[in-house]
Amino acid sequence: MKIEKCGWSEGLTSIKGNCHNFYTAISKDVTYKELKNLLNSKNIMLIDVREIWEILEYQKIPESINVPLDEVGEALQMNPRDFKEKYNEVKPSKSDS
């Protein structure tokens, strides 16, 4: 597996595998208040990777997009129309990072 710095976003690393390219950001813990402020500012796109049963049991995070973790790689490869149809949200673009 090859790990390299991505050219399109600071702080992201590309891990090139056989089928998909995955991108990870540097992990940063945020408080509830910080997250609430970020969501209110509209300067963040929060992808909630919990499973559907977790959303049903614990509720959806307001202003988040739910894409279960095992679907993230495939979801980010979808065309925008298919993403909108499946997740009922606008697909994030590389420039949103």
Curated annotation (Swiss-Prot):
<dbReference type="InterPro" id="IPR036873">
    <property type="entry name" value="Rhodanese-like_dom_sf"/>
</dbReference>
<dbReference type="Pfam" id="PF00581">
    <property type="entry name" value="Rhodanese"/>
</dbReference>
<dbReference type="InterPro" id="IPR001763">
    <property type="entry name" value="Rhodanese-like_dom"/>
</dbReference>
<feature type="modified residue" description="N6-succinyllysine">
    <location>
        <position position="84"/>
    </location>
</feature>
<protein>
    <recommendedName>
        <fullName>Thiosulfate sulfurtransferase/rhodanese-like domain-containing protein 3</fullName>
    </recommendedName>
</protein>
<feature type="domain" description="Rhodanese">
    <location>
        <begin position="32"/>
        <end position="84"/>
    </location>
</feature>
